[in-house]
Amino acid sequence: MAPTLATAHRRRWWMACTAVVENLFFSAVLLGWGSLLIMLKSEGFYSYLCHYPDNTTYHNSTGNETNQELVMDMNGWLICKEQDEMLNLAFTVGSFLLSAISLPLGIIMDKYGPRKLRLSGSASFGVSCLLIAYGASNPNSLSVLIFVALCLNGFGGMCMTFTSLTLPNMFGDLRSTFIALMIGSYASSAVTFPFIKVIYDLGVSFITILIVWAACAGLVFFNCFFNWPLEPFPGPEDMDYTVKIKFSWLGFDHKITGKQFYKQVTTVGRRLSVGGSMKNPKELSALQNGNKLCLSTVDLEVKCQADNAATPSFMKSVFSPILLLSLITMCVTQLRLIFYMGAMNNILEFLVEGDMDTVSLYTSIFGVLQLLCLLTAPVIGYIMDWKLKDCDDGKEDADEKDTNTDGKKKKKRDRQIQKITNATRAFAFTNFLLVGFGITCLINNLPLQILSFILHTIVRGFIHSAVGGLYAAVYPSTHFGSLTGLQSLISALFALLQQPLFLAMMGPLEGDPLWVNVGLLGVSMFGFCLPLYLIFYKRSLERQRKQKIEDSKLYLKINGTPDHEAFV
């Protein structure tokens, strides 16, 4: 039996804490591809593509050599460029699905809620672990299972991530901070495979590790089954779980929040009160045409807007400049980050001239640094929430705490303008870090790559948190899942370019990533388009607010009230 929204609200801290842990170990673990790649090679996945050519130079992972042409092995299995290309293709497919599946998931989640998706995701993740374990039992015949396993892994991981992004709706003004925390745990999940590699290096069987991991995914399934509600979590503007019940006896065939119910009842009551005072057919027809009359006088008529008039349509949100520019930013950033993750081991091999022990060491360092996302992602969330508590929340009544010592009301910031200001800072800062990361990648210095690891980790945590916070701030909560999914799908399609870039690096460029990195650095400059537009958008909002204040003063002189009304 699924819990109600009121029950889920009481358990929100438990759900948030477990969601962070579950994201850390069961969401985007595929982002730790460098460590998984080493283990897959050690278990012989696609090793049958490698052969000893004539005049070979044998080179194992400890550095012992004979003869001329280089051939290496790992844990007794041959490794080669053809194997790298095939496994990188599997990573490309899995990472694509990790993002591309977001759009249908977002649409489904907005309509049906997160519970069923999270149950499906945890089950898919467990099955993916079992498939990898089965493939490792006979890699010469079952290596192809890695494609199916990584697809299920990507699907399950995105289900876990996406559903956790609905939880921050229960935390009010801290929503962006909690979104950042969820995305931080998602980004930090890249540490999972490096952690598993440490256990693997201690001598634990790869198959045993995966079976235990699949069993842990079962615990995630049961946690969701007993704690997550069927209904979607409403946004903070509709938050009132204590009175959320089903009013079927009032003619509502859906569940509504207390605030929505209050709005429905007061609207109906107002229309009944005004309608009862009407005497002639003309006034009645005005009511039937969708107009409402103020209770104070029948002569004061105000056009009644439909509820959806205040909320932009989904297509209007899709074609808004903010969303389109955010797509450009995410496409560029996603390609830059995904290419580095997929090619990192080969880039390190190029720098150390094939020393696999050094490559393994730096891969482990990269994995450990992924935990930085848990610390850095909330920073961008804090930037997105900066000074929102000091903003005008739209209430007309001033509290005592909102007045100065001389009794005058404090001048508050506009909430929408403050959100745009915060988003501008977040995206500008993130893109500067992305450019810095691109510059460090151009320098062929091994110790400097640790700085590249740090910048890569910070940018990956920042960009997703910034986009999630921006969408939560600008667009209706009912569109959040669909818009985030659309953004993920388009950026995932663009990130497929990492496979031809990888083939170009391994083929014509002979393993040298210099020119690929130069091109990606140039493309990264497009990321500054979004913060520049947000600056102009903020100025437009400031002009509108100034005009609104001047209009309110005019109405105050005419009607004695700042409301935009006029007596007939």
Curated annotation (Swiss-Prot):
Transmembrane segments: 20-40, 89-109, 119-139, 142-162, 176-196, 202-222, 322-342, 364-384, 434-454, 461-481, 489-509, 516-536
Subcellular location: Cell membrane; Basolateral cell membrane
Record's catalysed reaction(s): L-leucine(in) = L-leucine(out); L-isoleucine(in) = L-isoleucine(out); L-methionine(in) = L-methionine(out); L-phenylalanine(in) = L-phenylalanine(out)
Secretion signal, residue range per the UniProt entry: none
Top-level lineage group: Eukaryota
GO cellular component: basolateral plasma membrane
Gene Ontology molecular functions: L-isoleucine transmembrane transporter activity; L-leucine transmembrane transporter activity; L-methionine transmembrane transporter activity; L-phenylalanine transmembrane transporter activity
InterPro entries per the UniProt record, alphabetical: MFS, MFS_trans_sf
Main location group: membrane
Stated role: Uniporter that mediates the transport of the stereospecific L-phenylalanine, L-methionine and L-branched-chain amino acids, between the extracellular space and the cytoplasm and may control the transepithelial (re)absorption of neutral amino acid in kidney and small intestine. The transport activity is mediated through facilitated diffusion and is sodium ions-, chloride ions- and pH-independent.
GO biological process: isoleucine transport; L-leucine transport; methionine transport; phenylalanine transport
Membrane topology: Multi-pass membrane protein
Name by which UniProt lists this protein: Large neutral amino acids transporter small subunit 4
Entry similarity comment: Belongs to the SLC43A transporter (TC 2.A.1.44) family.
